[in-house]
Amino acid sequence: MPAPVVMVIGTASSVGKSTLVAALCRLAARRGLRVAPFKAQNMSNNAAVTADGGEIARSTAVQAAAAGIAPTVAMNPILIKPEGQRRSQIIVEGRPWQTLAAGDFWRRKTLLWEVVTRNLDALRATYDLVIAEGAGSPVELNLKAGDIVNMRVAVYAQARTLLVGDIDRGGIFAQLLGTLMLLDPTERQLIQGLIVNRFRGDPALFVDGVRILEERSGIPVLGVVPWIEDLGLAEEDAVAIEQSTPVMAQGITIAVIRLPTIANFDDFDPLAREPGVTVRYIDRPGELAGVAAVIIPGVKHTIAARRWLRERGFDEALRRFPGAIVGICGGYQLLGERISDPLAVEGNGGDEVGLGLLPVETIFVTTKQTTQTVAHARVPWGGQAPLHGYEIHMGRTHRIGAASALLTIIQRGAQAVLEEDGCISPDGRVWGCYLHGLFTNDEFRHGWLRQLGWQPTTSVSGSVDPINRLADHVARALGETVLDRLFRLTE
């Protein structure tokens, strides 16, 4: 018999679906259930790499970690990676499928329904419970005919479905009741409960709100989840970095350039969680004032990002910048002398002069490198421990002359290798590499921060697992009885 499915849908994007699924995965795993997350289709440039080299959304990989299992492509069989100019690379079952304009994908997406059901069925045959996540709103009426991620999944799996609204953005009654009103009757009958998320203050003050929602909908409110600060889990959408933070008077501030089609910006979450470190996202050269370091992040379209940097006036600003300059993946490519795309891998192709801050050149090829990777640092402050991360890139970068490498790669997937990666300037101020997840490695992160003059204000070890913190928070809001019924441990 296929495993039951619990599904979390939301009234809009960024209402907390991903974090709630992560919490439920951890809470189910604590009860001894073999549980897996599932999201049929995701749109994000924040990608993770599975053990077999497939790509899935990082938010799904976090949910798998919450469940205590390794992520697989079955958990997120369709990943849309926007490239700009209304085009996206479509990843199907972990591998590049096609690069399509929005209209072309819309016309073809219903063909992918079989991919969705095949992978969901495989998870249901393997695990005791699957916790699925929707995307955006399930009642975008102009898009509903092509739905392969929201209520079509719920109906197919006959899922116990939860509807989540975000009270912090206001209009919680319109959010929840309006969504219910627009669902088809066969869809509405699957809704087992409502969740009011991100309540600031005492939830007891919303007792009347709970009563109104239950009276008008006939559906129980399973919990009012209070706002939780500084959770530190990977964000799915770039909307999470739209609000910048000021340069702090104490500690150090690191600027990350908010490039168009920025990718894998959760690379910098470990830096932001350190005491005495502020990470701010910038898009103007004037915002470099007072920061200790600037990071050029990964990006989905490197040549377009290069032109954007030039148009914004970053070329001269970065050349004059006295602090540390770092590039990760696409950012590493941008730091070099030249970027070439003779096969139009990124769309229109072309050839661009880089920022010229590192003696490297990049050429794009049609084969995508997607691996879980282990490396050693070749710099004294990088520590002795192996560095664990992942690679996702279609560029091949080589150093010019006697330039020094930053890392030695010793393993890709299950294969032992011995290959240099990255580059560092003679004075150590400018460096870059392809390894995402570099700053999750404590020795490397702390070593680099100390190079910037960082002095931790509290202990840098023994932090609480953010997933456990989140799970405890959600468990308090929903209660053990609700959770047991949801997971079908009791009826």
Curated annotation (Swiss-Prot):
Outline the extent of the GATase cobBQ-type domain: 251-444
Tell me the keywords, alphabetical order: Cobalamin biosynthesis, Glutamine amidotransferase
Which biological pathway? Cofactor biosynthesis; adenosylcobalamin biosynthesis
Task: State the function annotated in the UniProt record.
Answer: Catalyzes amidations at positions B, D, E, and G on adenosylcobyrinic A,C-diamide. NH(2) groups are provided by glutamine, and one molecule of ATP is hydrogenolyzed for each amidation.
> Family assignment?
Belongs to the CobB/CobQ family. CobQ subfamily.
NCBIfam families cross-referenced by the UniProt entry: cobQ, PRK00784.1
**Protein name, entry field:** Cobyric acid synthase
Q: Lineage of this protein's species?
A: Bacteria, Bacillati, Chloroflexota, Chloroflexia, Chloroflexales
Question: Which gene specifies this protein's sequence?
Answer: cobQ
